[in-house]
Every structure is written in C-alpha cells, then in structure tokens.
Regions:
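A bilobed periplasmic-binding-protein/Venus flytrap-type ligand-binding module shared by bacterial periplasmic
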Residues: 122-132, 230-245
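A conserved helix-loop-strand patch within extracytoplasmic ligand-binding domains
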Residues: 109-156
Length: 297
C-alpha cells in the first residue's frame, strides 16, 4: 500500500505541469494494415484507478497489435478540452449520466461517445466497517465521531461536484470540514485511520480496489443525492473514428464486468510492489488470454 500511494503521488507530480501535445506530427501519419494511424494517445484522469487500469490494459493490448501508445495523465477539464481539440485520441473513464455530465454538455459536440464498457459504476460515501453510522443522515448527527471531517479527492472531479452540490446540502453536512486534495491523499488517510482503528468518512466510488483492501461500508443514501448507478464510457476526439476506425470499433464492443476489473485493479494496485505496471498487466493478460484476445477479434 505505501508503495502504491508513493507511486501515484509521484505520477501526479510528474504530470502536474502537463502541456497538451498534438496527436499529429509533421508529415503523413504512419498507418497500420487495419487502416488506423499507428500512434494513439490515451488520456487518463489523475487518481481514478479504474481508468488507469483500463488504459494500461488497452495500452498493452494495442502494442501487441503494432500500435505506439502513449498515456497522458491530467484532470478531467484539460482531458475533455484536449479531446475536443484532437490533442488526445481517446479517454476510457467518462461516467454518465451524472459524474461527468457537465463536461459532456460543454464539449460533447466535438466528442464521440463510444459506449459504456461497465454499467456498475456508483459514487459513494464510505466509512470504516465498524463505524457507528449506516446512513448519510446518521453521519450528520454523529459528525463528531469522525472529528467533523469528510475526506474527499481532487477538487476538479465530478465526485467533488456531486458531494458539494448535492450530498452536503441534502444531508446537512455543512458543519463538517470537507477536505479536498487528491485521491492518493484520501487513500493515505484511509490507510492510517483503518490501521489505527479510527473512524473515517471518505468520498469513494465503485468499482474501486479499496473495497478489497480496507474494511469499509457504504453509507446508505435514502435521498438519492449520489445518484443511481452509472456507465463508464469511452469517448474519442472529434476525428477519432476517421483516424482510428478499427480501434473505434473495438472500443464500441468493449465490455468489462466488475469482477474482471477488480481482478486487474487488485493485481496493479493492491498486490504490486513494482513502480512499473507493464509486467503486472502482461501477467494478468496471460491469465485472462481468451477474454483479452476477444477485445480485438
């Protein structure tokens, strides 16, 4: 766990000064036999592990097919701006109809929705399993048991928007200190609190490997402030279907259930002590070869 958190924080630091780069170099782009441009840039949201896992998986799969793949990390706003400008080719972690709806409303005319590859996504407020509350209503009445703290993630995330605009006012959590910084910082606090047997409340989401790593429970949301289950969509830039017609078709057909996703996330983030995800993903691919081969068949 410490290695995972350190790795992620280093990655975030390295990408904080990211400058968007165009996908097209000078001169004609190199093309594969299947009609796709050889170069692919996948934009990945900072801190969202299901997107990191899916992106690393597709990077490995596409490199087997002869593509040159770059993963570029950024927060959602620059990702969608970059997609709309064709600075990125595709991103694999758009949650709809709630979490990233504002971005799609702003940039959607210049994007291509390639469909949902997982339909089980859910925003949550999670607490340690033995916490003295079971609902968000009870959290408001027992905030002192959590030192009046609710630990969030990146300020620019859709989860932060839903928490600030919907959850906090709906359940009267305004007197709690709502702390936003980053997903790694939230996970570090979660690690420390559960290790010390202390109460903690965090913003989280399913699917996420933390549910296997920590003794957690989701607080019930009787008012539906966090919304219903969402789909995790792939979105391409406005030229993506022209520059990568074969890959666009593969992504439209892409489906990954939560059990498979948990398996990949656990291998990458829970069981992995390496700074390099590549070998871990390659091993996971070998263990799931029949399914992986179906992605490009």
């Amino acid at each position: 766990m410490p290695q995972r958190l350190t790795r992620t924080m280093l990655a975030l630091g390295a990408t904080a000064a990211l400058t968007l780069t165009g996908c097209s170099a000078a001169g004609p782009a190199e093309t594969l036999e299947n009609g796709d441009e050889k170069d692919v840039t996948i934009a990945v949201f900072n801190g969202w592990d299901e997107g990191i896992a899916a992106s690393e998986l597709w990077k490995a799969v596409l490199e087997e097919q002869g593509y040159d793949v770059e993963l570029e990390y950024a927060d959602p706003a620059p990702v969608y701006q970059g997609l709309s400008d064709d600075d990125y080719d595709v991103t694999l972690d758009t949650w709809l109809p709630i979490t990233h709806a504002d971005y799609i409303e702003q940039y959607g005319d210049d994007l291509v929705d390639l469909g949902a590859w997982n339909e089980d996504a859910k925003l949550t407020i999670a607490v340690n399993e033995d916490a003295p509350v079971d609902t968000l209503e009870e959290l408001a009445a027992n905030a002192d048991a959590f030192d009046n703290r609710l630990v969030g993630i990146e300020p620019g995330s859709g989860l932060n928007r839903v928490t600030s605009d919907e959850v906090i006012p709906t359940y009267g959590l305004d007197d709690m200190d709502y702390l936003t910084s980053s997903t790694p910082a939230m996970l570090a606090e979660l690690t420390a609190a559960t290790g010390a047997g202390e109460n903690i409340a965090v913003t989280l989401w399913r699917p996420h490997w933390a549910y296997d790593a920590f003794p957690l429970k989701d607080l019930e949301d009787p008012q539906g402030a966090l919304g219903d289950a969402e789909g995790i969509h792939s979105f391409g830039g406005k030229s993506f279907e022209e520059t990568h017609p074969t890959l666009a078709g593969w992504l439209k057909d892409f489906q990954m259930d939560s059990d498979l996703l948990y398996s990949l996330e656990n291998a990458m983030f829970n069981e992995n002590d390496s700074d390099d995800y590549g070998p871990v993903v390659e091993q996971w691919i070998d263990e799931n070869r029949e399914w992986v081969d179906s992605l490009t068949s």
